[in-house]
């Protein structure tokens, strides 16, 4: 059995895509990454992702974290620039020894 919820309207499309992955017995990590990337990629959301508000130097800096519930491994990034989907980097880092990156 699986479940996935969204608490903000901006996540509905991503949750729908993730639900399809889970219904087809896909990987939960893939489903979560898909859901988050859908939000990160939408330019009209000003609090997160591609459309995020810039810092005082007028640069958009993004943060993300990922945790694998089976292994409890984590990955995180902070203040990265020029990359559309920080959740993908965080997920990849969860598989490495050094799981935290800044900038």
Indicate where each model-derived feature is located.
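Alpha/propeptide regions of enzymes that mature by internal proteolysis
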Residues: 1-103
């Amino acid at each position: 059995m699986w479940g996935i919820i969204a608490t903000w309207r901006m996540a509905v499309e991503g949750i729908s895509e993730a639900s399809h992955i889970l219904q087809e017995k896909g990987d939960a990590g893939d489903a979560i990454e898909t859901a988050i990337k859908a939000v990160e990629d939408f330019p009209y959301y000003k609090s997160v992702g591609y459309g995020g508000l810039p810092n005082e130097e007028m640069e958009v800096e993004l943060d993300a974290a990922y945790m694998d519930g089976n292994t409890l491994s984590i990955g995180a990034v902070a203040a990265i620039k020029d990359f559309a989907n920080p959740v993908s980097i965080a997920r990849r880092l969860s598989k490495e020894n050094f799981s935290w990156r800044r900038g």
